[in-house]
């Protein structure tokens, strides 16, 4: 996006009222953040500038302070990524994305007189507050020692682990598990003692196990979260709430934030005295396959046909979940084209792949009619 387009984006976001604005990575992101701020104030909105240095910290800020939304600009070399944020620190849902795209296309912005234009204020020390919130959210730590390696350049993660009393080792030490933050801090990567990198679903399952162990009995998850979490919660006396309209404000940030998840898991290790490998072994099997299925007809027509074919499927605003004998299937329309997003899950990789092939074929049959 060029400067004028980013300014228009700021004007479109001004309908939120207050827009938290942050950036990281270089002069390009900083310059475009200025353009976005100008767009917000020109449309009568109020800009809250902050020094949060990651998209995850910006999400936490909106959640913690109850802000109506925000925008974070991340620059990595020549690539610039924009992260619009809604209330509660949530990413934009599909309907909100469509409205925003429509407003940008039509340039449907408010342009008040000078006396009614917006303004801005500042929030400082966001990263320090974000780190403290992540550490304190993990609850009580146990007395067992925990040693971890951290990927180079992960200063924030190192600070959080040290705060919890975790011993840090060099990354290449044999037999020492490792962690890293990815996707702008929103995802946690884990390598166990044998050097195996665990899947995103396994890390999510371990985070849920840590929350249940800390005393929480309800897990608040998006509709597409793995069905294996329901088995985990049932076995440990908990329940799963699939939230169609976002997770409640301030609730279980460790399920969508890498730093919060790392702190939660470290305290879990300190309470149990088990290794990460042992904790992963006690989780239900969860192998996932993802596929985008292109369509010649419309997404809604094929989704409707699949819904009629499987009347017992759980229909939700974002898609539908189908529980079969060997696993589960999540089907949702793609946001940017005539296609379906299919996510299949089974205890074994072979099962997940077979389910993925099966649903792809079923969708293809309806698409051919």
Model-predicted segments: where are they?
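Buried hydrophobic packing segments
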Residues: 9, 36, 58-61, 157, ...
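Short, basic/hydrophobic alpha-helical segments
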Residues: 9-16, 114-118, 206-215
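Short glycine-rich phosphate-binding loop at a beta-alpha junction
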Residues: 17-26, 144-151, 217-223
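Phosphate-binding and adjacent anionic-ligand microenvironments
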Residues: 183-186, 193-196, 200, 206-207, ...
């Amino acid at each position: 996006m060029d400067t004028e387009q980013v300014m228009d984006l700021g004007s479109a976001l001004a309908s939120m009222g207050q827009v938290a604005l942050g950036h990281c990575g270089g002069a390009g992101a900083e310059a475009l953040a200025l353009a976005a701020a100008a767009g917000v104030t020109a449309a009568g909105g109020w800009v809250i500038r902050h020094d949060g240095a990651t998209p995850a910290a910006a999400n936490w800020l909106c959640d913690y302070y109850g802000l109506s939304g925000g925008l974070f600009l991340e620059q990595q070399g020549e690539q610039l990524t924009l992260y619009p944020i809604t209330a509660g620190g949530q990413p934009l849902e599909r309907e909100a994305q469509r409205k925003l795209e429509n407003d940008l296309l039509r340039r449907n912005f408010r342009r008040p007189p000078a006396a009614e234009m917006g303004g801005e204020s500042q929030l400082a020390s966001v990263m320090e507050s974000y780190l403290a919130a992540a550490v304190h959210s993990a609850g009580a730590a146990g007395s067992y020692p925990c040693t971890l390696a951290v990927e180079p350049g992960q200063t924030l993660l190192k600070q959080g682990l040290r705060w919890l009393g975790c011993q840090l080792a060099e990354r290449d030490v044999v037999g020492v598990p490792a962690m890293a933050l990815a996707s702008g801090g929103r995802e946690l990567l884990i390598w166990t003692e044998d050097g195996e990198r665990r899947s995103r679903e396994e890390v999510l399952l371990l985070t849920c196990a840590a929350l249940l162990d800390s005393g929480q009995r309800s897990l608040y998850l998006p509709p597409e979260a793995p069905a294996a979490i329901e088995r985990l919660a049932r076995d440990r006396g908990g329940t799963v709430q699939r939230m169609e309209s976002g997770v409640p404000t301030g609730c279980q940030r460790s399920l969508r934030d890498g730093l919060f998840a790392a702190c939660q898991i470290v305290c879990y290790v300190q309470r149990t005295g088990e290794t990460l490998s042992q904790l992963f072994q006690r989780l239900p099997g969860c192998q996932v396959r993802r596929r985008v299925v292109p369509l010649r007809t419309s997404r809604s027509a094929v989704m409707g046909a699949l819904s009629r074919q499987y009347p017992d499927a759980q229909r939700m605003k974002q898609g539908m979940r189908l529980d079969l004998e060997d696993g589960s299937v999540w089907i949702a329309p793609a946001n940017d084209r005539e296609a379906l997003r299919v996510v299949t899950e089974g205890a074994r990789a072979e099962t997940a792949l077979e389910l993925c092939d099966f649903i792809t074929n079923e969708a293809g049959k309806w698409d051919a009619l």
